[in-house]
Regions:
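Plant-skewed but cross-kingdom recognition/interaction modules and surfaces
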Residues: 8, 56, 60, 100, ...
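Flexible inter-domain hinge/linker segments at boundaries of tandem extracellular adhesion modules
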Residues: 29, 34-40, 86-92, 138-146, ...
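Conserved beta-strand position repeated across blades of beta-propeller domains
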Residues: 2, 32-35, 46, 54, ...
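Conserved core positions of repeat-based scaffolds
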Residues: 1-2, 11, 51-54, 63, ...
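Conserved loop/turn at the beginning of each blade in beta-propeller domains
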Residues: 24, 38, 46, 76-79, ...
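WD40/WD-repeat beta-propeller blade-loop signature
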Residues: 30, 41, 48-51, 82, ...
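Short glycine/serine- and acidic-residue-enriched loop/turn motifs that recur at repeat junctions
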Residues: 10-28, 66-80, 116, 120-134, ...
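Structural signature of WD-repeat beta-propellers
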Residues: 4, 15, 48-49, 56, ...
């Protein structure tokens, strides 16, 4: 998907499960505007492997695509062929959304710093202490009051960044993707201690690896590295965050 400066959304590629938002499962080989969002000014978008999401300038969240595991947040498992508003968040102003990579979870961040999660709950990636999934947005209470400013979803894990520069991760732990120095699963948001004090200002998440940049421009990487995706000239998996320049 692509978002223009005037708030229009275009999508293209494989159309299975209606994830392109064009009211069909047909694929598209060039960018096409999503007609259902033309009357809205969109400010943020996110793509999962089988579902998509968009946030309007007024804080409304829309999702569409595969509905399995409740990943769309509409209270059911129904696939949506066009964008549909997530009514369970209509009392909140949503400012960011993240869709799971190769996965079925979704995260949303509101303007008052609250994080909501829903969809498949395997390995605790929804951040509420268990592995149960849910089909409507539920608050990740562990992150209340810590000033979250960015959220991301990888494959079977989730990440959040606070305004104070702390990185929190949770979910599946193999490939050391969580950055805690262990391959154990973590079912509630937990601070990545090795980055404490480094003032992280932005994070990026792949399917199985993560990057974080500090206010001084240093970049740290951790997780899977089988294709050299950490940029450290090796294919060795990092158990903990490793700085590279």
């Amino acid at each position: 998907m692509a978002l223009t400066v005037d708030g229009r959304v275009f999508s293209w590629g494989e159309g299975d499960d209606g994830k392109l938002g064009h009211c069909s499962r047909l694929s598209c080989d060039k960018p096409r505007i999503i007609e259902a969002l033309k009357s809205k000014r969109v400010r943020d978008i996110s793509c999962g492997s089988s579902h998509s999401a968009a946030i309007t300038s007024s804080g409304e969240l829309f999702t569409w695509g595969c509905g399995e595991y409740g990943r769309l947040g509409h209270g059911d498992n129904v696939t949506q062929w066009r964008p549909k508003q997530v009514k369970h968040l209509s009392d909140h102003r949503v400012v960011q959304v993240a869709c799971g990579s190769r996965d079925a979870q979704t995260l949303a961040l509101t303007d008052d710093g609250m994080v909501f999660s829903w969809g498949d709950g395997d390995f605790g990636k929804l951040g509420r202490g268990g592995s149960e999934g849910c089909a409507i947005p539920q608050n990740v209470e562990k992150l209340n009051g810590v000033g979250i400013c960015q959220i991301e979803c990888g494959a079977q894990f989730s990440l959040a960044l606070s305004k104070g520069g702390l990185v929190w991760t949770w979910g599946k732990g193999d490939y050391f993707r969580l950055g805690h120095g262990s391959d154990q699963h973590v079912r509630k948001p937990t601070v990545v201690e090795c980055l404490r004090g480094k003032k992280i200002i932005h994070v990026a998440v792949g399917a199985l690896h993560c990057l974080a940049v500090t206010d001084s421009g240093q970049v740290y990487a951790w997780g899977d590295n089988d294709h050299g995706q950490q940029g450290n000239t090796t294919t060795t998996v990092n158990r903990k965050e490793k700085y590279f320049s």
